[in-house]
């Protein structure tokens, strides 16, 4: 009897669509000028002081180089896949997934601004939003129908691991070793945005699912 083999990995369409937008945005950024677009549409605390709120969103689709965009895309593919499936692959579920991604990204930028209220460094990249997807994915690591509790081993382990990674990134930045960070291109890593996005994803995933009646 002939059996159909399941693919090893099948990304849901909202994740594929999100990655398509990110890659298309960086292709356009590369064509126009990576630094020029980043300086114009990237996020900084200064942009908030100037009452420019668009960079809170536009920065999530810009990157500093191909290595940067590919590393973030891999994170989104890995952690966004289970999250998108939990939201559901219909129109409402996709809207919930995209909204969750954007909210985590915006809050990650605001977290960075809170840590650097007078800073003028420009932040670009999907890593803050991807961190939110990672946190949400940790709450799906359970055999039951609900979400894993905050105090469960998978949730605590992933949060601890991500905290440790970002403390190392912070130390590397202090020591001037940013060039050793994969995908950074030698630029400082906005580790504060990573942690803020992770916290946002961890806290907001459950309430959003409940609001959408998909808990």
State what each model feature region is:
Residues 1-215:
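A detector for small-residue-rich transmembrane helices and their helix-helix packing motifs
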